[in-house]
Structure formats: structure tokens, C-alpha cells
Amino acid sequence: MDQRVLTAMMPYFSDEFYNPSAAYLAARRVHDDIAMARHSLAKIIGAKSAEIIITAGATESINLALNGVDGTVVTTAIEHDSVLATARARGGVVLSVNSLGQIDLESLRSAITDQVALVSVGYVNSETGMIQDIRAIADVVQGIRDDRRQRGVERPLYLHTDASQAVGVLDLNVSRLGIDLMTLNAGKCYGPKQVGLLYVRAGIRLKPLIIGGGQEMGLRSGTENVTGIIGFAKAMELAESTRGSEVKRLTALRNQLKSYLVQHIPDIKINENQRRNSPAVLNFSVAGVDGERVVFALDERGVQVATGSACAANKGLRSHILVALGLSNAEADGSIRVSMGRFTTSEDIEAASQLIVEVISEQRKFGVMDA
């Protein structure tokens, strides 16, 4: 967590520890502070305060979006487990992508039958950093929506995107993106964990997941997470205020790492979309190398990397995302995800790149891999 975020949160852990739904003056002050934080979050994405639904994180936001509609859900094979599992549980349609992580717009158009109520496509892939053209997808959805209206089809059609990985890297303006629902997560921008939001465009009616006191426009009942909301707003403000300069800095760091690895690791495969990729993520594969062993060896030497998303890696599963991109099992098993952030320096990249090469060379030399 960014220290500035923690500083903003601290008063609400102690002196301002009031229930914002209460009627007394101190509680009303906290309620007003939450309202200001909600306004700040809304302003960053070009929305209205009433369109911001605070949740306990991206997974809850995604479940609210996907389970909140009546009808079929269409998504892609490279989505986060929270999207795929929810869509499949509802009998949803899962579309393939090409090797660059892009959805085929004609396939999408064909998949959106009159029974479909929601299309959910991630903005930035969590494992590879590949960026989807959300605006182009929105245009397809709008075209089908217009066609339904002309034919008298009453079922609404919405577009949802999980933009958790896009904060501080890409434009999040909901009007320019053309989306109806958007998931964001405080923990992905140096804010507190277990707090997120779902943007719900005005006029959209969702079924609530949690019923009770009617907080969050009736969609997410329960006493508000005051510290989380305050911290989330501060984290988003910081991320957006430095977005331009940070993208340039991260791009330079990613290029530095990529250049060194390509020069020193024979047969390395960079899993990226060169035209549309987040500067904060570099994913690469080395066939014949066990990715998990590389992660453990690097961790012992002070370098923290991953084999994929934390959720999948924790289960010891092969990345469904890399398999969907067309990688072989050997390439997927030999994949490493390196993320760069606000506190990463060029010196960090120099040291990490040398250690990555060292560990992979050792594995190849001694054949250290699972049978």
C-alpha cells in the first residue's frame, strides 16, 4: 500500500470510527467524507456518484454484474477465474481469442443471440497485460442493441469490463469506452485489499447479491467499509494524477527487462501483443523449464515473480490463459510473469534480469524440472 493512502485512512480507524448510517453529527461527517470519496472515484472514470457501487473487491463486483442480469452471458477464454466460473455456472458462452489475446468481432457478433443479456470482456489481461479494444467491442454491442430495439426485442444488452489491471495505465472514462458496467479493485492501485467498485450506468437494473439495509443504492447492503472507501479514492487519485509519466517510466523498465532476457535466454518466447500491451507486465515462456521452480529459486534470492495470476498459481494449475492463447503445455508450464510498479527502479530491473537468467541457466544446465 502507498503510504499516502494509509495516511488518508488512519483517522477512520480511530478518531472517526463511526457508522456512516447513524444520525448523530460525527456519523454524518463520516457519511459526508464517504460521499466525497465516491464523488472522487466517479469523477476519475467520468461517471456520476450514484453510479458507483462499492464492493468488497473485484470478484464481488464481477459476480454482481454477471449474476445481476437475466439472460445468457458471453465472455472470452482468457478472463479471470471469477468471470469464467460465474459465466460457466450460468451456462454462458465462452469465445476463443487469437494469439494476441484479441477477440474476433464477427464471432462476438454471432454469439450475441437474443437470449444474451451481458458481454463481459477484460480490459487488460491479468497474466499477459494484453489489452482488448473495448471501444470496438462496445460498438458491436451497441449495433446489436439498436437492432433489437428495431425488432422489438425487449431483453436489454449490457457490456461489462473488468478494468482492475488498467488503473494508472489506461483511460478509464466510461463514456469513451462505451461500457455499461465496469469493475475496479483498490488493491491493484496501491490501495487497501478487500475493497472495489462496480460502475453501473444510470438506468441499469441489477439483482442485488446482498440484501439488507439498502446501502449502495440497494445493490450491496451492509455497513460501509469507511477506511476502505477513503483509501480507494486516495489510491485512484494518485494513480490517475501520475498516469502519463508512470506509463513512460514503466515502458522503459519493461523494455529494459525484455531486451536483457531476449539477449541472454535462447529460445525465449515473449507472450505479448506488441501493439496493445500494458507496460506493467512482461510474460515470457521458456520451454523445458519448470516455471514454479524458477519462482521458488528467485524468491530465495530476493526476486518476486509469478507463474500466472495469484489465484491460479496458488492452486498449482496450468494457466488457462496461456493455453487459450495457443501456447503448448511445455510453454505454459515454463511461463513467468514479471510485474513492474510504482516503486520499481531501473536498478531493480537490472538485478532481477541477471538473476532470472542465472536461475533459468541453472535449470537448463542441470535439468531441474518435474517429470
Task: Tell what function each PLM region has.
Residues 1-371:
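Pyridoxal 5′-phosphate
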